Regions:
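Positively charged N-terminal leader segments that act as targeting/secretion signals
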Residues: 1-8
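Short, well-ordered beta-strand elements
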Residues: 11-17, 107-110
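Short N-terminal binding/cap micro-motifs at the start of the first secondary-structure element
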Residues: 21-25, 44
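Short helix-initiation/N-cap motifs at beta->coil->alpha
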Residues: 37-50, 132-143
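Short, glycine-/small- and polar/acidic-enriched structural segments
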Residues: 44-102
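Paired acidic/hydrophobic, glycine-rich loop segments that form the ligand-binding mouth/hinge
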Residues: 55-59, 150-156
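A conserved helix-loop-strand patch within extracytoplasmic ligand-binding domains
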Residues: 78-139
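Single conserved hydrophobic/aromatic residue that forms the stacking wall/gate
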Residues: 169-178
Length: 178
């Protein structure tokens, strides 16, 4: 159960993804104080709640472009979980790579399939860049940064770039990256 610390409750919150992911951004904005439990999959996130390793989980269930995320609704139903809150996050996709590289030096870009789909129009200007699907937006940014992979970019949040990489194209709310 949550531990009371001053005026705030300190709790363990599971997310699918890593720091800098959109689930992490929701967690930071929604909870006043928390310990983050990074999960590889939504199944792992649900297991952490069922096993009482976490008090809460942050899970996307709607996407304004793709609609309902039915597999996540199925997990909620299958494990009889309750939705206890809601947070709407405006998603801004940003292109990032190792510091010092330019977009002309990028041969491939990795990200979640939905992020790649939403940025397709932008990449028509860069036909040499191969788009490659990965399981999470921020996770591949982390991998590029940790392994110092040259010539490879990621599409993720600005916060992921702040943690792991360097921005080379910033999404602007009035002129979306996609």
């Amino acid at each position: 159960s949550p531990v009371k610390s001053g005026l705030f409750f300190y709790m363990k919150v599971s997310i699918q993804g890593v720091k800098g992911s959109f689930h992490h951004l929701v967690t930071v904005n929604y909870f006043s104080s928390f310990e983050l439990n990074e999960c590889s999959t939504f199944d792992e996130l649900v297991k952490s709640i069922i096993d009482e390793d976490s008090e809460y989980g942050v899970m996307a269930i709607e996407n304004s472009i793709a609609g309902s995320i039915l597999p996540n609704y199925a997990l909620i139903d299958e494990y009889n979980l309750s939705i206890t809150g809601e947070y709407s996050l405006s998603i801004d996709h940003n292109l990032m790579c190792l510091p010092g590289q330019s977009i002309d030096e990028i041969d491939e870009v990795h990200s979640h399939p939905m992020a790649l789909l939403q940025c397709t129009k932008f990449f028509t200007k860069y036909p040499k860049i191969k788009l490659i699907e990965s399981e999470d937006t921020a996770l591949f940014a982390k991998k590029i940064g940790e392994n110092k992979i040259n010539g490879v970019g990621a599409i993720a949040s600005k916060e992921a770039a702040d943690i792991y990489l360097s921005l080379i194209h910033i999404s602007e709310p009035t002129r979306p990256f996609h």
